[in-house]
């Protein structure tokens, strides 16, 4: 049975994001993934080095004029017979709620772990987010060219801390200065390590069979024997790879390598295109939308603000769920029930980013937006429904915001509410006083808000510390019990930007006590947009 051209395009797509702790090697992996996909011939351009290369595309020129850096937000590259969309998840200083929300727009994630350190804090948090939709996870144990922890120990740690079974696909032979390569458990092949630097991919020598004398000759008898002994253990103690369990988010295939040495990344990409799902169905408030449907649907998961005060426009990122986008198409913005013609959407295509006029499920479109689009907005060809599963996340950092000029309270509130609708920050107004508390997931969000309040609303604001550790949205089916809860906890309740009631806890202990005291009240860590 031959698929229609449209369904062939859908079947080719793989959309994924990378989750890792800062410094586990995400940027390097991103570079090398693009290198193996031939999207960039000189690794390093991800960081924007070699500016002469950037002048080729007029799309970049437009970006420079507008001061929006959206180049690396979505990268598309071909690999084997697939088209892969890699969505960037800002890590270091620019970590924000957007990082969490991006994970709601992909069909699969690659978890990168520094094999010298194991599971770290940020990885735990990001894994919790992928659990909301049981997203399939592939794992890459990175930095094998350094001294690493015992590989079995690393697998145990992933299983115990992240509650996901590990199925090793490749297994390392030595590490650090003694790193010799990896053995592929399912192909019965050993790939010998030669360091490739920058954009050179070395020809890898392959030894067939675990008991091949060539293996002993290549890695030394001791390491070859150690490998055989370890594999006995591994086969007895770890999970076998099972595609169904992988797609259900219950086990993760594990690959070992060194991104810096250009080694092992291709094994992982082979697994990604072979096993990761093509664009998945998605739930709305009325029905499930299949990627194979011919009518266009999509949802906005992120809005990138412009830091250049001369240009107020922002780019809304929309994940295509079904149907084909064509330039000049008329789409309905469901929340406002207005039809809009989308003629200048940015498409992120391999290589030439300017002239592509179509996009398919799994692809990401950038929509120009002057404040009319919100996070979670659904676009359709007329059907009135809203995609679910694009939440607000409970902030982890809080500050009180105060005006330099007290007469501008109204503008401040308006600005904060609009910024919260856009997803830049969350705002809480305590019921018992006139404070305004701003909540964020990353520190950068606070700076962005102050500079945008000044440039867009002409309001000068400063922050003060506030005694808030965390927030939870609260609801209760029993109205009488809810009233009692509200009466007794008035000093710790606040309304967010959308007038939803939240409990503001001064410490995690305080939150736990409240949860124990009021078992009928639900305390939610996320809230639908």
Curated annotation (Swiss-Prot):
Alphabetized Pfam families for the sequence: EF-G_D2, GTP_EFTU, RF3_C
UniProt keyword DNA-binding present: no
Protein residues bound to GTP: 20-27, 88-92, 142-145
Mitochondrion among keywords: no
Cysteines engaged in disulfide bonds, as pairs: none
UniProt-annotated location(s): Cytoplasm
One Gene Ontology term, aspect cellular component: cytosol
HAMAP family: Rel_fac_3
Function: Increases the formation of ribosomal termination complexes and stimulates activities of RF-1 and RF-2. It binds guanine nucleotides and has strong preference for UGA stop codons. It may interact directly with the ribosome. The stimulation of RF-1 and RF-2 is significantly reduced by GTP and GDP, but not by GMP.
Family to which the UniProt record says this protein belongs: Belongs to the TRAFAC class translation factor GTPase superfamily. Classic translation factor GTPase family. PrfC subfamily.
Protein name: Peptide chain release factor 3
Gene: prfC
């Amino acid at each position: 049975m031959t698929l229609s051209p449209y369904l062939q395009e859908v079947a080719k797509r793989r959309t994924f994001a990378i989750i890792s702790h800062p410094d586990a090697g995400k940027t390097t992996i991103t570079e090398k993934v693009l290198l193996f996909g031939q999207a960039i011939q000189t690794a390093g351009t991800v960081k924007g080095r070699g500016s002469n290369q950037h002048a080729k595309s007029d799309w970049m020129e437009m970006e420079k004029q507008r001061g929006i850096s959206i180049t690396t937000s979505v990268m598309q590259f071909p690999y084997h017979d697939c088209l892969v969309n890699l969505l960037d998840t800002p890590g270091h200083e620019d970590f924000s709620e957007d990082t969490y929300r991006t994970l709601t727009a992909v069909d699969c994630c690659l978890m990168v772990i520094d094999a010298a350190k194991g599971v770290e804090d940020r990885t735990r948090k990001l894994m919790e987010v992928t659990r909301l939709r049981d997203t399939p996870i592939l794992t890459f144990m990175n930095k094998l060219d350094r001294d690493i922890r015992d590989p079995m120990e690393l697998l145990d740690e992933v299983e115990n801390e992240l509650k996901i079974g590990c199925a090793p696909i490749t297994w390392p032979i030595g590490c650090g200065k003694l790193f010799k390569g990896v053995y592929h458990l399912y192909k019965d092949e050993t790939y010998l390590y030669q360091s490739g630097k920058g954009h050179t991919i070395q020809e890898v020598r392959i030894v067939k069979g675990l008991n091949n004398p060539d293996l002993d000759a290549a890695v030394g008898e001791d390491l070859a024997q150690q490998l055989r002994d370890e594999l006995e253990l591994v086969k007895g103690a770890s999970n076998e790879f099972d595609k169904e369990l992988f797609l259900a988010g219950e086990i993760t295939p594990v690959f070992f390598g060194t991104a810096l040495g250009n080694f092992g990344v291709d094994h992982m990409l082979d697994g990604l295109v072979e096993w990761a799902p093509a664009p998945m169905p998605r739930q709305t408030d009325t029905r499930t939308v299949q990627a194979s449907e011919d009518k266009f649907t999509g949802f906005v998961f992120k809005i990138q603000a412009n830091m250049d005060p001369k240009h107020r426009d922002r780019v809304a990122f929309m994940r295509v769920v079904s149907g084909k986008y064509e330039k000049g198409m008329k789409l309905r913005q469901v929340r406002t029930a207005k039809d809009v013609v989308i003629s200048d959407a940015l498409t992120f295509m391999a290589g030439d980013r300017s002239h592509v006029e179509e996009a398919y499920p799994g692809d990401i479109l950038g929509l120009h937006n002057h404040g009319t689009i919100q996070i979670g907005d659904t676009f359709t060809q007329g059907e009135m429904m809203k995609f679910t599963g694009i939440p607000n996340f409970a902030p982890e950092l809080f500050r009180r915001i105060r005006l330099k000029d007290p007469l501008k309270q109204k503008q401040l509130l308006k600005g904060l509410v609009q910024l919260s609708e856009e997803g830049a920050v969350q705002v809480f107004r305590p019921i018992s006083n006139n404070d305004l508390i701003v909540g964020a997931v990353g520190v950068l969000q606070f700076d962005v808000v102050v500079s945008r309040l000044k440039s867009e609303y002409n309001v000068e604001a400063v922050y003060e510390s506030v005694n808030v550790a965390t927030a939870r949205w609260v609801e209760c089916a029993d109205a009488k019990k809810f009233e009692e809860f509200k009466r007794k906890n008035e000093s710790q309740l606040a309304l967010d930007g959308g007038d939803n009631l939240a409990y503001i806890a001064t410490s995690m202990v305080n939150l736990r006590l409240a949860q124990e005291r009021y078992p009928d009240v639900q305390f939610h860590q996320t809230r639908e947009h």
